[in-house]
Design a protein with these regions (language model features):
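Helix-to-loop junction immediately C-terminal to a conserved catalytic motif
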Residues: 49
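ABC ATPase NBD coupling module
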Residues: 66-82, 112-115, 119
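Conserved ABC ATPase "signature" region
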Residues: 113-138
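Catalytic Walker B motif of ABC-type/P-loop ATPase nucleotide-binding domains
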Residues: 167-170
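Conserved ABC ATPase signature
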Residues: 142-146, 150
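H-loop/switch region of ABC-family ATPase nucleotide-binding domains
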Residues: 203-204
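Helix N-cap at the start of a conserved alpha-helix in ABC-type nucleotide-binding domains
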Residues: 178-180
Length: 242
């Protein structure tokens, strides 16, 4: 469970990016975040994943206040989280399988991963996760030969093998065609349901948020102006957001 109270963030000299954002997120939820460009979506995700410090507010993760997390404590927390971006953080020359195995970096001796001496159990686990995202037949393909949607699904498998409990997906389907985007979002939704992962997913397409979000958030001017169970947004709600 994640609880955030009155999280605010500004950039000098006086540009308010986030203003008193409060929420509770429970395991198994896919929270679809929509909002205009510049509404604060990426900054919110960067704060929640401890990539950026916020100005004020309380952040509770699994019952512990982590608002002042530093150093080693922050690194330990990041083991529980994965961050997916529009352009996945993958090695293009390595195979899909080796990229997924690299997700074990935080949990295995680093030299085993880099030298390719991961165990047969590790390989089987990685293959299982590739199968889960529908890419078993692409396991030995260099990532540079995969489509944009396939790369994003490799990134999801990489997040799963490291045991991520929370996934921050920042515009993961931007630039993908509708079919490829749907496959990525199907995978994220499936992960929520089966693995009880919390997924925060920012989207440009309202129709995807309505279809896949167990909850929909609307961010406008750095404020959380809409927080509803997944359904079609009313025109009034759209007007509040956009």
């Amino acid at each position: 469970m994640i609880i955030v109270r009155n999280l605010s963030k500004s950039f000098p000299p006086d540009h308010q990016i986030l203003s008193k954002v409060s929420f509770q997120a429970d395991e198994g939820e896919l929270i679809a975040l929509v909002g205009a460009s510049g509404s604060g979506k990426t900054t919110l995700f960067r704060c929640l994943s401890l990539k950026e410090k916020w100005d004020e507010g309380q952040y509770i993760y699994e019952g512990k206040d982590i608002s002042e997390a530093r150093g080693l404590e922050k690194l330990k927390l990041r083991k529980d989280w994965a961050y997916l971006e529009e352009k996945p953080n993958l090695n293009p020359r390595k195979s899909a399988l080796k990229n997924v195995l690299s997700g074990l970096f935080l949990h295995k001796a680093w030299w085993r991963i880099l030298s390719g001496t991961t165990s047969s159990d590790d390989h089987m686990t990685a293959m299982d996760y590739l199968d889960k995202v529908g890419l078993l037949d692409k396991a030995h393909e260099p990532v540079e030969k995969l489509s944009g949607g396939e790369k994003q699904r490799v990134a999801i498998a990489k997040a799963l093998i490291r045991g991520a409990k929370v996934i921050y997906a920042d515009e993961p389907v931007s630039g993908l065609d509708p079919e490829a985007a749907s496959k990525v979002l199907d995978d994220l939704k499936d992960i929520c349901r089966k693995d009880k992962v919390i997924v925060f997913c920012s989207l440009h397409q309202v129709e995807f948020a309505e279809k896949y979000g167990s909850r929909i958030w609307g961010l406008s001017g750095g404020r959380l102006v809409v927080d509803i169970a997944g359904r079609r947004l009313t025109q009034r709600e759209k007007d509040l957001i956009f």
